[in-house]
Amino acid sequence: MSYNYVVTAQKPTAVNACVTGHFTSEDDLNLLIAKNTRLEIYVVTPEGLRPVKEVGMYGKIAVMELFRPKGESKDLLFILTAKYNACILEYKQSGDSIDIITRAHGNVQDRIGRPSETGIIGIIDPDCRMIGLRLYDGLFKVIPLERDNKELKAFNIRLEELHVIDVKFLYSCQAPTICFVYQDPQGRHVKTYEVSLREKEFSKGPWKQENVEAEASMVIAVPEPFGGAIIIGQESITYHNGDKYLAIAPPIIKQSTIVCHNRVDVNGSRYLLGDMEGRLFMLLLEKEEQMDGSVTLKDLRVELLGETSIAECLTYLDNGVVFVGSRLGDSQLVKLTTESNEQGSYVVVMETFTNLGPIVDMCVVDLERQGQGQLVTCSGAFKEGSLRIIRNGIGIHEHASIDLPGIKGLWPLRVAADRDTDDTLVLSFVGQTRVLTLTGEEVEETDLAGFVDDQQTFFCGNVAHQQLIQITSASVRLVSQNPQNLVSEWKEPQGRKVSVCSCNSRQVLLAVGRVLYYLEIHPGELRQTSCTEMEHEVACLDVTPLGGNDTLSSLCAIGLWTDISARILSLPGFQLLHKEMLGGEIIPRSILMTSFESSHYLLCALGDGALFYFSLNTDTGLLSDRKKVTLGTQPTVLRTFRSLSTTNVFACSDRPTVIYSSNHKLVFSNVNLKEVNYMCPLNSEGYPDSLALANNSTLTIGTIDEIQKLHIRTVPLFESPRKICYQEVSQCFGVLSSRIEVQDASGGSSPLRPSASTQALSSSVSCSKLFSGSTSPHETSFGEEVEVHNLLIIDQHTFEVLHTHQFLQNEYTLSLVSCKLGKDPTTYFVVGTAMVYPDEAEPKQGRIVVFQYNDGKLQTVAEKEVKGAVYSMVEFNGKLLASINSTVRLYEWTAEKELRTECNHYNNIMALYLKTKGDFILVGDLMRSVLLLAYKPMEGNFEEIARDFNPNWMSAVEILDDDNFLGAENAFNLFVCQKDSAATTDEERQHLQEVGLFHLGEFVNVFCHGSLVMQNLGETSPPTQGSVLFGTVNGMIGLVTSLSESWYNLLLDVQNRLNKVIKSVGKIEHSFWRSFHTERKTEPATGFIDGDLIESFLDISRPKMQEVIANLQIDDGSGMKRETTVDDLIKVVEELTRIH
């Protein structure tokens, strides 16, 4: 068997449907967005979109419609999934808890029936009498909407028009009436039928129209007063209602195909239309009032409003604001203006929502050399094409920086009385202190009355009773704010120097060697309340009040030298409440008591970058739940700051980290800065909600990203990226991309828009010795679009396009690798191509081109003609392995810098994917699943070891380990095949056994080994081995990792228990959702644990957790079993969440 854990690192981001209505209450205007399996619910507010809830569906959302049956005060939601689960959902809120109730559900799949090529269509009668579904050719399925029906029952009506393009219910008809566009051998036609619920039959509709435009593809039902329907084609827009027929053919819509529409007004007088190029149009219906008071349509008009992301769906919200949902680029919130701008556009982008989809290719690189992978993806398509750099961590955006070496501490001050923003920054150096005044964004050095500037400051801040405090090694100085002068000074009775200190607004804690002093701050006075001597020297201490800023802390935390301990003492009496031996020889350097999400913690950082953290009981001072993580390699300084009204901790070190709490568990997110020695929060007029950070040489002021797990940076290319690879020696990426050009009258072609390949710093064009002249006997005609393919060389730091190389006419780039070949020390970029002509079923010729990039120049070193398309290439033991149509071929690199064929393997339909490990080669075929080859170096040939005999249409493959091979196929499933080395017969050995099956519900385009997280974070490492990331069409990033059998069995047990406790939205069974499903077969999932379900354990209430673990046995580490506690399982699941 093979045991794997699959989990989401980034949820899908591509929007495939959006609707607006009153779902959460009758007064709220809601926007609902479907992102494959996820449903996001927002309320539209004057400030923008406010997220209300996100729901994970056990299915791919195929249809999503709001409707309001009679007797309901707010809208209900109808959802149909790709596996034909239908449900009607209602929003229920009681207090803080939000529930999505399933009012009715059912599965509407037919045992037989051919799924329609134009996909699933779901529509609801405007009078809410029925739901209509077109799932299969020749059938129209009806779900009657009866009020108290808990089960959705459906019946089919035969539809003699087999090929339906689009269908809608018409408004205000006595009986429910459908209007549809269909195709037959004569062309496309429009027809209407009435649906009879009693007879379960169609009867003749009110009107029909034969021979509409050949490309007619969309029906829009128009409400009263007009009624009827609008038919949208490639070149024309027509209106019908039985008596009236009106057609227009505006040239403006011909350039591209309209793909989505949305009604603006309730009376249907304006519609938004979006096309494949991202243009947004307004369709206006002009009315004419008749003598008898009725309204008829006078004219149709189309106006171009401007450009948006390429829209998959549009929805008009309110006040001229439109949500543009995109699958190929970022989604947007745009405002329509009454006046156009200089470019003639009426569209203003208000907000952008990141979308990584479609992820076509990706690679993992450690650019910052911090031992952490970053994922660089080829995302989007056409004008939305981009590279996305995805890092696990938090970004700091620099707003100002000053060269100031040697900073030893920094603190914000509000010097002027009664200010609520900081106006001063105090910086401490060895032997001196400097004060910077902040006015707006200007910074200048000043002096502060009552402060000393010839000593190093240990702490400085605003304290109670409108006073400031400065603590140096010599004394504690209390300064009044108004007038500003020294009012009290405390010195150590024997005149010894203060070694460490901590201070809040009313208390001061100081250590002088082993002696602790406790002072309280009063108006104009520092009062020493108590002192005590510890058995060792004090290394660090903290007196942060956990009740809030103005309260007294009844506890203090101390870290000691010599015995390496952390202690909790009471104040003011210094009674020892808890002593925790940290072990080892590294002293604690920073200690901090803090609260996250109303849970109290003690954090203690050591001099080697390790951090211990404990739960702290503030009543007893006891520590529990000891855990340890490694944050860096140098001493760490802990400081709290607030961001978006939550408390976070910044750990300053060589690997700066933000510590925050999510769902009551601590998350450690690294920050995109090389090194931070000291930091403090800063909230001044010129720099609101900022952080001041110091490293060895510089002071930086910046703002911090939203505290979240993944940080995404976008590099727009404005053309389609296809493949990416990284070349360390030249510190750049190679990217294959294609742009669209339009054929002009002279036979040449010109780009549609500026993009990465037309704006590079330098460029070159292929001229092949192999294909002389234009190889194109296939002429393209004037105005036709052609694809132009390029290799882009992109700088790894600035992401600037340094060079672009344009390939031949009709030459498509398919594969790319950066590698060294043979004994040649040079690292090359190698590109595989195909000559693509419209009249050839598959390419008959292509090239492998070897490039060298050096000092800003790209040279063609070698090219090799091949008889087919070079679908995939990998470096293989110093040679080049390529798959060309159905052949797998190995090339060696000669001393003359030429590619020479060494051996071939021919037994494939179309070899699309190659992965290698040692001498083994995994081949992914178009339709014949996967095949394992071994290269025999002595004989110089390939041997076929084993293959999977199941017909899987592959989309990506990866080698997990020597015996296990991972595949993704085109029905959104994952599977694992295993090599059976122990089999007794040759025949059994030649079969790869399918030992893992899982329905992912995502189309995987690429697998690659690598991880997004720092390795070795926890003390107990998670029970997983290896890490394979994958990227999907919907922009999801997932991870597959392997488990031991005992861990698999434990998690499988937990998974089954969770399924009993967690109720799914729409009442879809988890086992049904995850079962491996193709047109040929459905089999239960096996060999995979659903990590998303396991992680949801952390989000359920404690009583529910208790229910899950009842009588669950866990291994105590010595091979003995014992009953699991809730905290045991929380710890296990938390460890698992840290792998992504």
From Swiss-Prot:
UniProtKB keywords: Biological rhythms, Cytoplasm, DNA damage, DNA repair, DNA-binding, Nucleus, Repeat, Ubl conjugation pathway
GO terms of molecular function: DNA binding
Compartments, record wording: Cytoplasm; Nucleus
Gene Ontology terms describing biological process: DNA repair; proteasome-mediated ubiquitin-dependent protein catabolic process; protein ubiquitination; regulation of circadian rhythm; rhythmic process
Region described as WD repeat beta-propeller B: 391-708
Region WD repeat beta-propeller C, annotated ranges: 709-1043
Keyword Cytoplasm attributed: yes
UniProt region (WD repeat beta-propeller A), positions on chain: 13-356
Signal peptide interval: none
Taxonomic superkingdom: Eukaryota
Pathway: Protein modification; protein ubiquitination
UniProt key word Transferase: no
GO cellular component terms, A-Z: Cul4-RING E3 ubiquitin ligase complex; Cul4A-RING E3 ubiquitin ligase complex; Cul4B-RING E3 ubiquitin ligase complex; cytoplasm; nucleus; site of double-strand break
Major location (coarse): cytoplasm
Subunit structure: Component of the UV-DDB complex which includes ddb1 and ddb2. Component of numerous DCX (DDB1-CUL4-X-box) E3 ubiquitin-protein ligase complexes which consist of a core of ddb1, cul4a or cul4b and rbx1, and a substrate receptor, such as CRBN. DDB1 may recruit specific substrate targeting subunits to the DCX complex. These substrate targeting subunits are generally known as DCAF (DDB1- and CUL4-associated factor) or CDW (CUL4-DDB1-associated WD40-repeat) proteins.
Record family assignment: Belongs to the DDB1 family.
Function: Protein, which is both involved in DNA repair and protein ubiquitination, as part of the UV-DDB complex and DCX (DDB1-CUL4-X-box) complexes, respectively. Core component of the UV-DDB complex (UV-damaged DNA-binding protein complex), a complex that recognizes UV-induced DNA damage and recruit proteins of the nucleotide excision repair pathway (the NER pathway) to initiate DNA repair. The UV-DDB complex may recognize UV-induced DNA damage and recruit proteins of the nucleotide excision repair pathway (the NER pathway) to initiate DNA repair.
Free-text comment about domains: The core of the protein consists of three WD40 beta-propeller domains.
Protein name: DNA damage-binding protein 1
Organism: Xenopus laevis (African clawed frog)
Lineage: Eukaryota, Metazoa, Chordata, Craniata, Vertebrata
